[in-house]
Design a protein with these regions (language model features):
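Primarily extracytoplasmic/secreted proteins
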Residues: 1-220
Length: 220
């Protein structure tokens, strides 16, 4: 029976900027094995991310939600990112009219093949929400990104860790959560200014498998 490592949370970062078509911010990656850097972009409008780099290396687009009232979230990733402090540089398809925020989180001991094991989205009109999905393996982590018409960014529910939140005419935020035992899970936000349109996206990563003595012998 396979055994798995414990995912290690490395670092978070984030930014919110004005009406631009490109921007950058720094993220610091520590030392560890089987690393992943995840970039999250939440926005409203006819905007898409054209490209993202970290230390000049391109990230891969892993999941983009649908649009609800023009709200969306995007998730990009880079496997084995360089250690140290480097720039995350983002290029947008067109100028974002001050309606976005971006965050990043890095982990170690993460499965490197097809890293987003579960993807999910939920949209609606509410002053708070709980997005339900199913995890598929013990020890997974969920990363979510949301944006809404609220002029208050809202608060993550218990068990989630905030990565970045932005309060403006359209607010947004992102977080991560350790999922524990596989099965039914939720992520959520509360405290929006009133019942307003929102979109929330989720991706799930899973721990890397331990390489035991038997597996090592098979490779000899």
């Amino acid at each position: 029976m396979a055994s798995y490592k414990d995912i290690v949370v490395d670092a978070t970062s984030g930014t919110d900027v004005g009406a631009v078509d490109n921007f950058s911010f720094n993220h610091t990656v520590g030392s560890g094995n089987e690393g992943i850097l995840i970039f999250i972009y939440s926005s409203r409008g006819a905007i898409a991310v054209s490209g993202v780099t970290f230390n000049g290396v391109a990230l891969t687009s892993g999941y983009v939600t649908g649009k609800f009232d023009n709200f969306l979230s995007e998730f990009w990733y880079l496997l084995k990112p360089a250690t140290g402090t480097h720039s995350i540089a983002v290029t947008l398809s067109t100028t974002d009219n001050n309606r976005h925020c971006a965050g990043a989180v890095s982990f170690f001991n993460v499965e490197q093949t097809d890293p987003f094991k579960v993807t999910d989205e939920q949209s609606g009109t509410a002053s708070s929400f709980s997005n339900s999905f199913n995890s598929t393996l013990d020890g997974q982590y969920a990363i979510d990104g949301q944006s809404s018409s609220s002029d208050v960014a809202g608060t993550v529910v218990a068990g989630q860790t905030l990565i970045k939140a932005r309060t403006s005419t359209e607010s947004c935020g992102m977080s991560y959560k350790s999922l524990g035992t596989s099965g039914a899970e939720t992520v959520g936000w509360t405290g929006f200014s009133s019942s307003l349109p929102y979109m929330d996206g989720v991706v799930v990563i899973q721990p890397a498998e331990e390489v035991g003595a038997a597996a090592i012998l098979l490779t000899l």
